[in-house]
Amino acid sequence: MHALSQEPTVWHGTTILTVRKGGRVVVGGDGQVSIGQTVIKSNARKVRKLGKGDVIGGFAGATADAFTLFERLESKLEQYPGQLTRAAVELAKDWRTDRYLRRLEAMMIVADKEVSLVLTGTGDVLEPEAGVMAIGSGGNYALAAARALIDTDKDAESIVRKSLDIAADICVYTNRNITIEALSAE
């Protein structure tokens, strides 16, 4: 239980979306953090550049867990520079087998100029279909919107922004305080 209500502590939230289009990769996420039915923070930054700025990461789930995973991923990127897929697979192996890491509750989207990936606590490392992937409570809404917009004349950033706005219209755990990071994918 927590002081804000009489329900068990359940962290809800977020929507993270990545779109690859027109030589760019864009990762965006909303800023809402909720416990139960209460919004605790509306401007959390869940998307950021990692390593030397050549990888973008976004997370859904418990914030402390996500930052632990970001740190581990940055360590793997130092071991395997320029090899995001290899670093992600090595992190996923650790995540599955390490007793401490196995308890972490988060999912991550990571992207560099060549590949976008979703990492899960079950050891999955997934590459998106058609350059679009989303995670979090509003992920399915953002994913559907982005897929509908991918073949229009909108650029990757516009697709991410519009899709996250649509997710915020539908998902009560997603807001319009959007953080965007982008890389040239050339």
Swiss-Prot record:
GO-annotated molecular function: metal ion binding; threonine-type endopeptidase activity
GO biological process entries: proteolysis involved in protein catabolic process
InterPro entries per UniProt: ATP-dep_Prtase_HsIV_su (IPR022281), Ntn_hydrolases_N (IPR029055), Proteasome_sua/b (IPR001353), Proteasome_suB-type (IPR023333)
Function, as annotated: Protease subunit of a proteasome-like degradation complex believed to be a general protein degrading machinery.
Pfam family, one: Proteasome
EC numbers on record: 3.4.25.2
Activity modulation notes: Allosterically activated by HslU binding.
Coiled coil: none
Protein name: ATP-dependent protease subunit HslV
Family statement drawn from the similarity comment of this UniProt entry: Belongs to the peptidase T1B family. HslV subfamily.
Assembly and oligomerization: A double ring-shaped homohexamer of HslV is capped on each side by a ring-shaped HslU homohexamer. The assembly of the HslU/HslV complex is dependent on binding of ATP.
Enzyme type, top EC level: hydrolase
Main localisation: cytoplasm
Binding-site residues for Na(+), renumbered to this chain: A168, C171, T174
Cysteine pairings via disulfide bonds: none
Alphabetized CDD domains for the sequence: protease_HslV (cd01913)
Catalytic reaction list: ATP-dependent cleavage of peptide bonds with broad specificity
Alphabetic keyword roster: Allosteric enzyme, Cytoplasm, Hydrolase, Metal-binding, Protease, Sodium, Threonine protease
Compartment list: Cytoplasm
Active-site residues (renumbered): T14
Gene Ontology CC: one annotated term: proteasome core complex
